[in-house]
């Protein structure tokens, strides 16, 4: 199957590309021109199943100029300011929503049947108990607000397309919780702890009053693939004919 992955050099995107290639799919990995993270994909560059496309996020509606085949599955992971101070920047996060809608339009042009977006647990806001897909969202960060805003706009656009016969597409909104594993930022909590412990050093923590959910990167990728290739991606809290919301997280006790 022909599959598009934006944000392909990210922690999640790179792992997904590797898994899809290993399964024999033709992967079109969208990378920003001059990306400093391109090296995370270097082991795939000589594989006949892997194709690197250089485009900025605001150009994602133009991928049909470089990809000449239909791509039934499209993963949109491209997002500015995911792990930086720009998570708080409304201008940066607002542009992500606009760029995401361009990605959706670009996917339509490529004959996409299932569009999968990397949402976040940040959409729920501050919660003291289990976060289920039907829980009302009260995002606090600009990052979380933008993720949920894009989900609403994309769901409505796909509904319009399906109702008017423009195309038939499913929009799948994944809410990804904390992920760890090879390729994660060296300053992440898990990596920092492991580095300290391996060197016999102590690690300073706060009061440790929060219960937090972590999922291994390989398990996340398997979950994403399950959503991409299942017969029908029906989720909770949305129109089952068109969309689905899925939490991707570790098992909850």
Show the residue positions of the predicted features.
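Conserved Rossmann-fold NAD(P)-dependent oxidoreductase catalytic core, especially the SDR/UDP-sugar
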Residues: 74-76, 80, 101-142
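Short-chain dehydrogenase/reductase
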Residues: 93, 140-151, 187-188, 213-214
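Glycine-rich Rossmann NAD(P)(H)-binding loop
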Residues: 6, 178-183, 204-212, 236-253
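Flexible, glycine-rich beta-alpha linker
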Residues: 124-125, 141-142, 172-189
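Alpha-helical substrate-binding/gating segment
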Residues: 191-203, 214-246
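NAD(P)H-binding glycine-rich loop region in Rossmannoid oxidoreductase-like domains
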Residues: 54-95
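Active-site Tyr-X1-5-Lys
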Residues: 140-172, 198
């Amino acid at each position: 199957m022909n599959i598009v992955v934006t944000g392909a050099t990210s922690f999640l995107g790179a792992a997904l590309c590797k898994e899809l290639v290993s399964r024999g799919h033709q992967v079109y990995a969208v990378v920003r021109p001059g990306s400093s993270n391109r090296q995370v994909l270097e082991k795939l560059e000589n594989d006949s199943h892997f194709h690197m496309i250089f485009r900025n996020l605001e150009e994602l509606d133009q991928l049909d100029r470089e990809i000449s085949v239909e791509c039934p599955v499209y993963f949109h992971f491209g997002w500015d300011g995911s792990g930086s101070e720009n998570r708080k920047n409304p201008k940066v996060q607002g542009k992500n929503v606009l760029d995401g809608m361009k990605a959706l339009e670009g996917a339509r042009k490529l004959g996409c049947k299932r569009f999968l977006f990397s949402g976040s647990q940040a959409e729920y806001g501050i919660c003291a108990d289990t976060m289920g897909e039907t829980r009302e969202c009260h995002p606090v960060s600009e990052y979380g607000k933008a993720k949920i805003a894009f989900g609403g706009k994309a769901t409505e656009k796909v509904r319009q397309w399906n109702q008017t016969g423009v195309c038939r597409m499913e929009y799948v909104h994944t809410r990804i919780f904390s992920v760890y594993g090879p390729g994660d930022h060296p300053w992440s909590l898990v990596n920092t702890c492991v580095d300290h412990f391996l060197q016999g050093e102590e690690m300073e923590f706060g009061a440790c009053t929060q219960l937090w959910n972590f999922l291994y990167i390989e398990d996340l990728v398997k979950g994403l693939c399950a959503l991409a290739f299942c017969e029908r991606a029906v989720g909770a809290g949305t129109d089952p004919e068109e969309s689905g919301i899925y939490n991707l997280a570790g098992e909850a006790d």
